[in-house]
């Protein structure tokens, strides 16, 4: 998992509430369990004018010019700004995979669906909760200023605007530690590999019958 420390990046606005996981990555693209390759189909039904299916050459599909993420000013964005209850609907880890593969490192919203929120942390994507008033202000600034960038410092738990205004956000110490060090659940477990091996060897000596056969 990629570590997250700090970034300064273009912000892309998605001015919709209740964006569900099927909108983030439609169900027909869920056949793979690899974490990569989903970016070209993120927001597929809004992003393209035709219906997408696995195996299609996305470079030849007609883009929807009215979809915000298709606008030239938001190309290369690494921060997604959106509205409340982002990531609702069915549980699919493919949703944060798709956002990560698209290039996003963080998502800012007033609220997130619980399962999606937890899945973001497991996949190196930082979900930031701000108040609706703060999100409204950011939407106005993003839309009024082309090339608008925000700076996110995870260690300090701050988000800074181009004018120098700073917002703080909450995150548990455990989740912050994992993101700062690029540790998913497997990586976190492997940090304790020596202790695990020592425990298993001690148990092998004290309870050898468990290991016979």
UniProtKB/Swiss-Prot annotation:
GO terms for molecular function: 3-isopropylmalate dehydratase activity. One of its GO terms (biological process) is L-leucine biosynthetic process. It catalyses: (2R,3S)-3-isopropylmalate = (2S)-2-isopropylmalate. It comes from the Bacteria. The keyword Amino-acid biosynthesis applies. Keywords: Amino-acid biosynthesis, Branched-chain amino acid biosynthesis, Leucine biosynthesis, Lyase. Pfam families: Aconitase_C. This is 3-isopropylmalate dehydratase small subunit. The lineage of its organism: Bacteria, Pseudomonadati, Pseudomonadota, Betaproteobacteria, Neisseriales. The gene is leuD.
């Amino acid at each position: 998992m990629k570590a997250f420390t700090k970034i300064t990046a273009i912000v892309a606005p998605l001015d919709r509430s209740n964006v569900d996981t099927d909108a983030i990555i439609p169900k027909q693209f869920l056949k793979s369990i690899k974490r990569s390759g989903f970016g070209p189909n993120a927001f597929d039904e809004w992003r393209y004018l035709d219906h997408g299916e696995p195996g299609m050459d996305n470079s030849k599909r007609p883009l929807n010019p009215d979809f915000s993420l298709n606008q030239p000013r938001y190309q290369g964005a690494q921060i997604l700004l959106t509205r409340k209850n982002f990531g609702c609907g069915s549980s699919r880890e493919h949703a944060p995979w798709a956002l990560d593969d698209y290039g996003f490192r963080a998502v800012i919203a007033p609220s997130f669906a619980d399962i999606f929120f937890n899945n973001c942390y497991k996949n190196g994507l930082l979900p930031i909760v701000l108040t609706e008033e703060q999100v409204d202000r950011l939407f106005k600034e993003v839309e009024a200023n082309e090339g608008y960038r925000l700076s996110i410092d995870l260690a300090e738990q701050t988000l800074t605007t181009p004018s120098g205004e700073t917002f703080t956000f909450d995150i548990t110490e455990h989740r912050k530690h994992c993101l700062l060090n690029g540790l998913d659940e497997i990586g976190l477990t492997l940090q304790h590999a020596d202790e695990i091996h020592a425990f298993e060897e001690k148990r092998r000596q004290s309870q050898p019958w468990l290991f016979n056969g």
